[in-house]
């Protein structure tokens, strides 16, 4: 029977690529989303992947979402925490809600999701948790104190939970993408991309969502049990942690 994989933020951008790649690798995939019903319905129609809507910043919503996924598909063995938002501005202009929204969605969601799957994983003595952090959680970024703090927190969370899960067959790893060719990044002015961003990347190009997805498929595999507590930098050489 195929293992069940749940991807938060799994219907757009990097998350959509992850959902598609896991399905292609033979997993029974559930893709969480939190915003556009129309976009999620289109994704489901194109891929055949089941979609589930809930707010990952709410513990109760995550509990209900996990319960529904497991009732319909079976126990969740692979969790990919990919959902995230930005509310960029310099700290001296940042409103409290811009801080809390990013922290609660990007970092709080890891507790909300992991807490609701970890007991089942421990009972079954198997689990793969993969957290999508960011290069900006490693190096920081101007105008992103909230986002950088949350993404750095994801790395710390990963290392701590990896120690707790190691003896019961649960691996926990983080992936830190750099600039990836999502719709959001590709919408940037070409002049900004060509003059300000690409020169910082030694390989001279943006990453592709599918490249991150392939990393996830590897870390999710049954035979990837040696890898836990790791932070995989996928940034084309832009930053070395």
Listing of model-derived features with the role each one plays in the protein:
Residues 119, 163-164, 225:
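Alpha-helical segment proximal to the catalytic Tyr-Lys
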Residues 90-91, 98-103, 129, 185, ...:
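Substrate-binding pocket helix/loop in short-chain dehydrogenase/reductase
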């Amino acid at each position: 029977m195929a293992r069940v994989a749940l991807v938060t933020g799994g219907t757009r951008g990097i998350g959509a690529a992850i959902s598609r790649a896991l399905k292609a690798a033979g997993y029974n995939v559930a893709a969480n989303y939190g915003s556009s019903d129309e976009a999620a319905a289109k994704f489901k129609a194109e891929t055949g992947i089941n979609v589930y809507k809930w707010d990952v910043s709410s513990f109760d919503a995550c509990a209900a979402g996990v319960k529904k996924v497991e009732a319909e598909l079976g126990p969740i063995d692979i969790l990919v925490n990919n959902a995230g938002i930005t509310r960029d501005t310099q700290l001296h202009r940042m409103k409290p809600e811009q801080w809390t929204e990013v922290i609660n969605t990007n970092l709080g969601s890891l507790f909300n999701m992991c807490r609701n799957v970890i007991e089942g994983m421990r009972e079954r003595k198997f689990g793969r948790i993969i957290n999508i952090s960011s290069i900006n959680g490693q190096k920081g970024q101007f105008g992103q104190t909230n986002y950088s703090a949350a993404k750095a927190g994801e790395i710390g969370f990963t290392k701590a939970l990896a120690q707790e899960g190691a003896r019961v067959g649960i691996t926990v790893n983080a992936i830190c993408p750099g600039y990836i060719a999502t719709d959001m990044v590709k919408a940037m002015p070409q002049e900004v991309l060509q003059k300000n961003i690409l020169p910082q990347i030694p390989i001279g190009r943006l990453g592709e969502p599918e490249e991150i997805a392939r990393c996830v498929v590897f870390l999710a595999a049954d035979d990837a049990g040696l890898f836990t507590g790791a932070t995989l930098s996928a940034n084309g050489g832009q930053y070395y942690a």
